[in-house]
């Protein structure tokens, strides 16, 4: 306010919006609670170097995720000991490695990844690739990953 008090050239317009001055702990707590409730539903988003995933549904011995692989994102060349996976492409054209074979899938196409198979997803496109992943198995945790290659330095 010290600058405005000394200015000779001021214009003002009426602004009719909710306003809260963060001058007290009470106001800071109020804003914190608003933001906490707004983002509470997003707690199942997990960010990775290649993009992110959201846990959509977790049942007995199965887990449904939505994967979002950013442009030029590459998942590890990996395998799992306790789960198989089924991928359904909903957006983009991912390059899939399954054992020694490579495929390019389009929206609406799917692929089954048997337990113990070496696999990878790559997004060579400019827009994100979206995949619905169904995991089926006795252990459905991120610790069930053996990484053979990883462009982000996470290989075992």
Regions found by a protein language model. Give the residues of each.
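Double-stranded beta-helix
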Residues: 43-47, 120-156
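Left-handed beta-helix
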Residues: 1-111, 117-120, 140, 146
């Amino acid at each position: 306010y010290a600058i405005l008090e000394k200015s000779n050239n001021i214009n003002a317009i009426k602004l009719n919006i909710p306003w809260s001055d963060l001058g007290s702990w009470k106001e800071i707590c109020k804003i914190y609670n608003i933001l906490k409730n707004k983002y509470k539903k997003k707690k199942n988003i997990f960010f990775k170097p290649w993009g992110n995933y959201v846990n959509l549904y977790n049942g007995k011995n199965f887990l449904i995720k939505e994967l979002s692989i950013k442009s030029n994102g590459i998942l590890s060349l990996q395998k799992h000991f306790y789960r198989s996976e089924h991928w359904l492409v909903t957006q983009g054209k991912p390059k899939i490695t399954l054992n020694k074979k490579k495929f390019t899938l389009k929206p609406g196409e799917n692929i089954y990844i048997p337990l113990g198979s070496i696999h990878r997803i790559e997004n060579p496109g400019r827009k994100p690739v979206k995949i619905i992943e169904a995991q089926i198995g006795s252990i459905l945790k991120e610790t069930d990953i053996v990484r053979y290659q990883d462009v982000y330095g996470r290989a075992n």
